[in-house]
């Protein structure tokens, strides 16, 4: 056990074998504790409300309530809870819907167990964690998208560009603040300003915008 409280994880997946495997592995991590398991989105929302997890590992295709709907419900009730989606496929509509609903990470079910743990830790730290194939898909989608925001009516300041560049590297507000020698609260304000100017809805979209505009290297 670490000196700090472990990351409280809720697993939501309709396959019992997946839930069991994830629980066994995550409970072996010194900084994690699986506090609950749910078999569908509706149960997941109820358990998130009751257990108040730090991070939810969420399947997307489930009976009663799908993962995207559950993500939206959980984030509306508990915005501080981070959500990482886990699926066995990459479908653009599902990926974008999950991220727009509030997910901060996306990993595939065939990923190495260590990658799943890394995604949980990244989400807990306020960072973005995307499977490389998912990041490439979304970056390509942004390249194909034609939007008035491609030519910024309200250009970013140099400091905002610095923050956006660090967002593109997946940094949390705390890490951005430490890197730029500003407070975490100031970093959060910069992020909010950037999202507003670019017409983006989330840190994930901002990170992909940074990749598209070559502020950081494109993933794999």
Where are the language model's segments positioned?
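Active-site residues of response regulator receiver
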Residues: 13, 59, 87
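The feature encodes the CheY-like receiver
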Residues: 18, 63
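Active-site beta3 strand of CheY-like receiver
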Residues: 51-57
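Short, conserved "switch-loop" micro-motifs in signal-transduction and mechanochemical regulators
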Residues: 77, 89-90, 185
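Recognition helix of helix-turn-helix DNA-binding domains
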Residues: 170-205
